[in-house]
From Swiss-Prot:
Gene3D superfamilies (alphabetical): 3.30.230.10
Keyword entries, A-Z: Chloroplast, Plastid, Ribonucleoprotein, Ribosomal protein
NCBIfam families associated with the record: PRK00132.1
SUPFAM superfamilies found in the cross-reference section: Ribosomal protein S5 domain 2-like (SSF54211)
A Gene Ontology BP annotation from the UniProt entry: translation
GO cellular component assignments: chloroplast; small ribosomal subunit
Subcellular location per the Swiss-Prot or TrEMBL entry: Plastid, Chloroplast
Coiled coil: none
GO molecular function, one term: structural constituent of ribosome
Protein name (record): Small ribosomal subunit protein uS9c
Similarity comment: family membership: Belongs to the universal ribosomal protein uS9 family.
Gene of this entry: rps9
Organism: Thalassiosira pseudonana
Amino acid sequence: MNTVFQKDKIGIGKRKRAVARVFLVPGTGTITINKVSGEKYLQYNTNYLNAIKAPLEKLNLTNQFDIVAIVRGGGLTGQTDSIKLGVARLLCKMEHENRLVLKPFGFLSRDARIKERKKYGLRKARKASQYSKR
């Protein structure tokens, strides 16, 4: 797969600690994540696969594009949602009318929730040792 991608044809999505760079290539609807087939990478979880394909399905473009993603960081849930956001952003970049379709479904919303840092003196971010009054 020695395809050269143009810089303006890239969609970037983030969720939790995961960052995805997404490319849409004219094709048959296959998903490739980190040079591995999407089914294998996502452990054959249909929920993850359907989530990635959802923006394309809303626009009836499922079998017209192959999704190629490079993802770093996070777990499978964060990576899946970051790819989904990247696909939606790239579809809007390709054609502005797609934004009007995808926006009501929440595909263009970045989920800003990230892990809270651990504070000193506590066991976790908020968990403290049991308080004894006497």
